[in-house]
Amino acid sequence: MLVSVRVGRIIPKYKAATPFCVLGWAKIWAKQNLFLELTHIMTNSHSSQIPIAMTIAGSDSGGGAGIQADLRTFAFHCVHGTSVLTCITAQNTQGVTRVDAMSPESVTAQFEAVMIDMRIGAIKTGMLLNQEIIKIVAKKLVAFGFGNVVVDPVMVSRTGAQLIDDEAIKTMRDVLIPLAAIATPNRYEAQILADMDIHSLEDMQTAAQNIYKLGARSVLVKGGGMTGDLKAVDVWFDGDRLEVLQTEVIDTNHTHGTGCTLSAAIAANLALGKPRFQAVQEAKNYVTEALKYALAIGKGQGPVGHFFPL
């Protein structure tokens, strides 16, 4: 198939998290500035080279978080997105009114259908509503020998509201976290996983090290739920490297889906073959840019702008 692309304007500056397909074309466009013709030949022989990622998460009917946010994030990074739906939520920018879990059989069937057919480069997990689903997901990850997993342990919201029951939380801690290449808890989730209170940067660092001891190969404790400048500070620990990652604080109320977007961006970067720490750095920068172009839709908290101006 012959695809012809005409460029009508210069690509805005965006370095760290620029997706590979945009970056590759941008290098050509930058040399010619405007109205260049780019021809790209795509054949079936190239299909196996297309990076593929999977999201195992819930659906957000309002389109701001969950698999909707994940798939948009994958698309931005030019990664083909696949999905395993774990629950269906009725929600909008103002809140959640209903949650229905998918059956374990459905979750299993979705996962196996994709895994036996495609070469998945990375997987992220999001909302796993109950103990049974968490166990099924963990069992299938082990059965397929898949290790490139980003675990977003969706247990507590950034406002401190518990989202799953205590039994599911324990299963998340004991069964799924040890399978994570990268675990990405927010403040309140990190408090549960690390069994400690978190009020300072030093607490975040200690929590990251404690969660690492649960078996995760690396941990990113997010500033979500923290106050002041710490809202834009995350802490990374991988057993050797303890890093503080800080970006500018974006003044917006429209932050719905931020955590989903971050973990999806990390997974996309892993699928592109980037090392874990680099994948996290670029994902964090991507989310910062997306927050600058957050969408003021609905009557409440809108989502981040996944496709900020390109």
What are these regions (language model features)?
Residues 56-62, 243-256:
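Short pre-catalytic strand/loop immediately N-terminal to key active-site residues, enriched for Gly-Thr
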